[in-house]
Swiss-Prot record:
Keywords linked to the UniProt accession: Differentiation, Nucleus, Phosphoprotein, RNA-binding, Spermatogenesis
Record's compositionally biased regions (Basic and acidic residues): 425-440
GO molecular function, one term: mRNA binding
Record note on quaternary structure: Heterodimer; heterodimerizes with METTL3 to form an antiparallel heterodimer that constitutes an active methyltransferase. Component of the WMM complex, a N6-methyltransferase complex composed of a catalytic subcomplex, named MAC, and of an associated subcomplex, named MACOM. The MAC subcomplex is composed of METTL3 and METTL14. The MACOM subcomplex is composed of WTAP, ZC3H13, CBLL1/HAKAI, VIRMA, and, in some cases of RBM15 (RBM15 or RBM15B).
Disulfide bond entries: none
Species whose genome carries this gene: Homo sapiens (Human)
Main location: nucleus
Function according to Swiss-Prot or TrEMBL: The METTL3-METTL14 heterodimer forms a N6-methyltransferase complex that methylates adenosine residues at the N(6) position of some mRNAs and regulates the circadian clock, differentiation of embryonic stem cells and cortical neurogenesis. In the heterodimer formed with METTL3, METTL14 constitutes the RNA-binding scaffold that recognizes the substrate rather than the catalytic core. N6-methyladenosine (m6A), which takes place at the 5'-[AG]GAC-3' consensus sites of some mRNAs, plays a role in mRNA stability and processing.
Nucleus recorded as keyword: yes
Protein name, as recorded: N(6)-adenosine-methyltransferase non-catalytic subunit METTL14
Gene: METTL14
């Protein structure tokens, strides 16, 4: 206790010395000569008491606190002098221009000193895109923590490699070539048109003819598509998102998925591209629209599709400026999903020639396509399918089995209990259209009529 009291006295003595220097007094003992006399202080106290009586209740709590705590005028004056001294010391400090260096001043949360994952601000600071920090995006390490899926992918890749046809390719100007000559009908069609958008973004002159969406719509894709088939259309990231859907409808497809290619810049952070004149921001992704033709249900058509094996995202490093190559992962997604072996790649290049695919494009340097030879690979019944092993069937994700009518609530068992003409809940009424039984003509979830009107 004595040490604490001694510490307080020393601090008070030091405070009085600082006040003496601030007020121009000779010593700490002569501060009273500089300050108001006792009579003047008494007058000030009386004035404060008078003002306190009429003090507005809306005044700041800090001001009322000083009056309520009963502090002496000398203590208040000392505190005021301390604040004044601190303020003057801050004003005397040399001015330093604040230079923005990082995002530490923009932390999320007012009570936290920990930097949060503000990847957008980090991109402004370093040039690293937010997608650079997504983990396990490669084909090799994507399923490291999912052994069941990893084994499924391995088995499917082995089966696909065994069932693939030899690679075939045809050098042809697709604009002048009649694609109806390609036989037989295809289960999967991949279109990779050289859109003007790709070259407009990079500012590089195209070394091949750029296709407009009007040109793409003129392709007779519906003539070479099987009744039950899928199409994958690379459409960029601009107007192609809408015009690509128009193409799918024209060819008889329904859009069922949108595969998004997210481009990272780990190897070259901060790189800026030529801004597309039609864009507000720099685009770092592209879209591949997926369409379905015919009736294909994942719960019943397990011989033709295996759903939920891959995701609808492709995350790879952005190619060099002028390179319009698409990621090879799109082929893996298609082959894992659709079990059809008749696969066509339009606007292909030498680098995209692949077993199991017929590649057609104007930039190919050679051709080996023979219609009869290609058709012979699928002459046997159901030979257009890759097939499936028992182990793959066991491992692959499946849809829940369809419920029976009694489980869904339809049919007679539920209709007689909750709805229908003899409703089980509630007492019978003599009125023919009484609706208190949750059934009758109102349609009591399984009764004779689903809605409020009889069927036409």
């Amino acid at each position: 206790m004595d040490s604490r009291l001694q510490e307080i006295r020393e601090r008070q003595k030091l405070r009085r010395q600082l006040l003496a220097q601030q007020l121009g007094a000779e010593s700490a003992d002569s501060i009273g000569a500089v300050l108001n006399s006792k009579d003047e202080q008494r007058e000030i106290a009386e004035t404060r008491e008078t003002c306190r009586a009429s003090y507005d209740t809306s005044a700041p709590n800090a001001k009322r606190k000083y009056l309520d705590e009963g502090e002496t005028d000398e203590d208040k004056m000392e505190e005021y002098k301390d604040e004044l001294e601190m303020q003057q010391d801050e004003e005397n400090l040399p001015y330093e221009e604040e230079i923005y260096k990082d995002s530490s001043t923009f932390l999320k949360g007012t009570q936290s000193l920990n930097p949060h994952n503000d990847y957008c601000q980090h991109f402004v600071d370093t040039g690293h895109r937010p997608q650079n920090f997504i983990r396990d995006v490669g084909l090799a390490d994507r399923f490291e923590e999912y052994p069941k899926l990893r084994e499924l992918i391995r088995l499917k890749d082995e089966l696909i490699a065994k069932s693939n046809t030899p690679p075939m390719y045809l050098q042809a100007d697709i604009e002048a070539f009649d694609i109806r000559e390609l036989t037989p009908k295809f289960d999967v069609i991949l279109l990779e048109p050289p859109l003007e958008e790709y070259y407009r973004e990079t500012g590089i002159t195209a070394n091949e003819k750029c296709w407009t969406w009007d040109d793409i719509m003129k392709l007779e894709i519906d003539e070479i598509a099987a009744p039950r088939s899928f199409i994958f259309l690379w459409c960029g990231s601009g107007e192609g998102l809408d015009l690509g859907r128009v193409c799918l409808r024209k060819w008889g497809y329904r859009r069922c998925e949108d595969i998004c290619w997210i481009k990272t810049n780990k190897n070259n952070p901060g790189k800026t591209k030529t801004l597309d004149p039609k864009a507000v921001f720099q685009r770092t992704k592209e879209h591949c629209l997926m369409g379905i033709k015919g009736t294909v249900k994942r719960s019943t058509d397990g011989d033709f599709i295996h759903a939920n094996v891959d995701i609808d995202l492709i995350i790879t490093e952005e190619p060099e400026i002028g390179n319009i190559e698409k990621p090879v992962e799109i082929f893996h997604i298609i082959e894992h999903f659709c079990l059809g072996r008749r696969r066509l790649h339009l606007f292909g290049r030498d680098s995209t020639i692949r077993p199991g695919w017929l590649t057609v494009g104007p930039t190919l340097t050679n051709s080996n396509y023979n219609a009869e030879t290609y058709a012979s690979y699928f002459s046997a019944p159901n030979s257009y399918l890759t097939g499936c092993t028992e182990e793959i069937e066991r491992l692959r994700p499946k849809s829940p089995p369809p419920k029976s009518k009694s489980d869904r609530g339809g049919g007679a068992p539920r209709g007689g209990g909750r709805g229908g003409t003899s409703a089980g809940r509630g007492r019978e009424r003599n009125r023919s259209n009484f609706r208190g039984e949750r059934g009758g003509f109102r349609g009591g979830r399984g009764g004779a009529h689903r809605g409020g009107f009889p069927p036409r």
